[in-house]
Amino acid sequence: MCYSKINNSLRKRFRTFYPVVIDIETAGFNPETDAILEIAIITLKMNEFGLLEKEHLLHFHIQPFKGSRIDKKAIEFHGIDPFSPLRRAISEYEALYSIFNLIHKGIKSNNCTKSIIVAHNAIFDYNFLTAAITRTKIKNNPFHSFVIFDTATLSGLAVGQTVLARACKAIGLTFDNNQAHSALYDTQQTANLFCKIVNRWKTLGGWPPNDTRTIKL
């Protein structure tokens, strides 16, 4: 394999980690007591030019777990009806099983070691995901136990904005506020934002680190 192909692999770019963009919509702010209502993930790939792109998408509506708390303010904020039959919601375990299965395939095909969460204000999604994994007792968690990529932090560095909508617009992406706070839409936009930041850094000469185009400060 030639040097350029090695540097253009996910394994090389992210230190053997397989980045997966995730967004979780919930019925509150406490990951131990408040229900997960919706989850979406997008896996990523490198194209032939070493640019990051979206690959696979999974999106699920989630049944509130037994005894979970539903905060009315959270429901008013995102407009999700937890008990609507039109959502065709599934259990946390079913959703995590499908998500983990897809991620493990991606880890294997890219010769990576672990997956890494990419999310906007990532600690929120990380905490809810971790609580659901503990609650369901599901095995083979593919995610790194503490390393995460937070696009709020990255976009603050890249474009001086930390709010998802503002960061997207600042980097040249459109953002529809009417679709915001849907796990599906927010995951798509977070993935677009992350790819833009990573690819712009490469274009500026920041990757690979010894690229002769690297800008000297």
UniProtKB/Swiss-Prot annotation:
Say yes or no: keyword GTP-binding present: no
Q: Which residues bind Mg(2+) 2?
A: D23, E25, H181, D186
Q: Which cofactor(s) are needed, names only?
A: Mg(2+)
For site (Important for substrate binding and specificity), what residue positions does UniProt give? F29, F77, F124, F146
User: What does the record say about how the cofactor binds?
Assistant: Binds two Mg(2+) per subunit. The active form of the enzyme binds two Mg(2+) ions in its active site. The first Mg(2+) forms only one salt bridge with the protein.
Q: Name one GO cellular component term.
A: cytosol
Q: What Gene Ontology molecular-function terms does this entry list?
A: 3'-5' exonuclease activity; magnesium ion binding; nucleic acid binding; RNA exonuclease activity, producing 5'-phosphomonoesters
Q: Which UniProt keywords apply?
A: Exonuclease, Hydrolase, Magnesium, Metal-binding, Nuclease, tRNA processing
EC number(s): the record gives 3.1.13.-
Residues forming the catalytic site = H181
Residues given in the record as Mg(2+) 1 binding sites? D23
Which Pfam families does the record cross-reference, listed alphabetically? RNase_T
One GO biological process term: tRNA processing
Give all residue intervals belonging to the Exonuclease domain: 20-194
Write down the InterPro entries for this protein, in alphabetical order: Exonuclease_RNaseT/DNA_pol3, RNase_T, RNaseH-like_sf, RNaseH_sf
What pairs make up the disulfide bonds?
none
Return the similarity comment.
Answer: Belongs to the RNase T family.
What job does the chain carry out?
A: Trims short 3' overhangs of a variety of RNA species, leaving a one or two nucleotide 3' overhang. Responsible for the end-turnover of tRNA: specifically removes the terminal AMP residue from uncharged tRNA (tRNA-C-C-A). Also appears to be involved in tRNA biosynthesis.
Query: Which NCBIfam families does the record match to this protein?
Result: RNaseT
Q: Self-association or partners: how does it assemble?
A: Homodimer.
Protein's name according to its UniProt entry: Ribonuclease T
